[in-house]
Amino acid sequence: MTYPGILLKKQQLMARKELGQNFLSDPNAARMIVTKAGISDQDRVLEIGPGLGALTIPAAKLARDLVAVEKDTRLAGILMEELKRESIENVELINNDILHQDLNTLFRGEKIIVIGNLPYNISSQVLFMLVENRHLIKRAVLMFQKELTERISASPGGRDYGRLSVVMQYCSTVKKIADLPPHLFFPKPAVDSRVIEVNFFETTPYSGERERFLFKVIKAAFSKRRKTLRNSLAGGELDIDTKVSAKILETAEIDPVRRAETLSVEEYSRLSDALWSMHGSEEV
């Protein structure tokens, strides 16, 4: 593993702060992450944001094949050269934004393992994208800023509890693997990073249109986080008034003056059921 600073200096490049680029520079940490991903020679792997290849190279040596999606054209060029230098031929490198990548077309229904060191500015968006594509995912081993992982596992009523918490807890289990300090990266980030394993449930209470409606309700509730649920549900995407929202909350046995961050996943399911049952009436 070539030190990221050396690779960048050789190409007269700098990490792009606006893309949240902090490259893993410790080979032991990279091997640990790849090992925890449980990759075998039968597995297809998706790597999100491979950067300079810290995870790509050891993962590709274990996998059947690996698809790496990198937004930064400069890094894609450097990584291609590194793969050639290592004589690695089972990597497909795609220069694209992962948020614009169609995973169904890319993998055609095959189960995949997902790995990646995710920049903070798109971490939540990537997780929501993975939730939408979870039918493809065998498991995911991902690295985020520690703060983001605490939001995923937060409990109702806490400051960190939000839309991401509810959605992830509804459809997955998340396990901490390791915390990585700033000195293991180049350039050094200002905060600690955490590696987590995400395993999506085989089945969930809802699917298809019904699940999309649940997610819509959760998003609406948190869109006006400081307001009571009666007010946060009114208007916006749900297009109901405060009288109707109060009635729906009463049906769901939820106090209308509570706020979004106090509801459990089960309570959001009840709220969604109540809204869904009224959705075709003149009141909604």
Curated annotation (Swiss-Prot):
Subcellular location: Cytoplasm
Binding site for S-adenosyl-L-methionine: 22, 24, 49, 70, 97, 117
Residue intervals passing through the bilayer: none
Reactions catalysed, as given in the entry: adenosine(1518)/adenosine(1519) in 16S rRNA + 4 S-adenosyl-L-methionine = N(6)-dimethyladenosine(1518)/N(6)-dimethyladenosine(1519) in 16S rRNA + 4 S-adenosyl-L-homocysteine + 4 H(+)
Major subcellular site: cytoplasm
Pfam families named among the record's database cross-references: RrnaAD
Any one Gene Ontology molecular-function term assigned to this protein's record: 16S rRNA (adenine(1518)-N(6)/adenine(1519)-N(6))-dimethyltransferase activity
EC number: 2.1.1.182
Enzyme class: transferase
UniProt keyword annotations, A-Z: Cytoplasm, Methyltransferase, RNA-binding, rRNA processing, S-adenosyl-L-methionine, Transferase
PROSITE patterns linked: RRNA_A_DIMETH, SAM_RNA_A_N6_MT
CDD domains in alphabetical order: AdoMet_MTases (cd02440)
Keyword Methyltransferase on entry: yes
A GO cellular component annotation in the UniProt record: cytosol
Function text: Specifically dimethylates two adjacent adenosines (A1518 and A1519) in the loop of a conserved hairpin near the 3'-end of 16S rRNA in the 30S particle. May play a critical role in biogenesis of 30S subunits.
PANTHER family: DIMETHYLADENOSINE TRANSFERASE, DIMETHYLADENOSINE TRANSFERASE-RELATED
Family: Belongs to the class I-like SAM-binding methyltransferase superfamily. rRNA adenine N(6)-methyltransferase family. RsmA subfamily.
HAMAP family, per database record: 16SrRNA_methyltr_A (MF_00607)
Name under which the protein is recorded: Ribosomal RNA small subunit methyltransferase A
